Regions:
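Cell-envelope and extracellular/periplasmic
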Residues: 1-5
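A glycine-rich, often tryptophan-bearing local segment used as a flexible ligand/cofactor-contacting loop or short
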Residues: 6-89
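Active-site oxyanion/phosphate-handling segment shared across diverse enzymes
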Residues: 86-105
Length: 105
């Protein structure tokens, strides 16, 4: 599971993550995993590695930023999706911002 934001990993840890992914083992990403190992072009500390194209190469995405935080996220269009079972989609309010990820593979 990848749940980090803009981190350079120690080389040994990076190689373990990279090998896990490259051999086709499963990987799950949580929100900021889009830019998990990107330092926006900055040099990583000595002995650390980055993966600037992680988003495109692993997730098939293209993270370009995020929308501003709104007071609510409407989910009515997905009301019949199994993941929303038991959720009142008419009153649900999510807080936070949504990522801009286009195109999605």
């Amino acid at each position: 599971m990848v749940s980090v934001r803009r981190r350079a990993l120690k080389a040994a840890n990076f190689k373990a993550v990279e090998e896990h992914i490259r051999v086709g083992k499963p990987v799950i990403g949580i929100r900021t995993a889009n830019h998990a190992f990107s330092l926006r072009g900055l040099e990583p500390p000595k002995g650390h590695l980055v993966w600037e194209n992680f988003d495109a190469e692993v997730w098939g995405g293209s993270y370009t930023g995020h929308h501003g935080a709104n007071k609510a996220v409407k989910i009515q269009k997905l009301s019949d999706h199994p993941i929303l079972e038991g959720i009142d989609v008419d009153t649900f309010k999510g807080r936070g911002s949504l990522y801009i990820v286009k195109p999605i593979a």
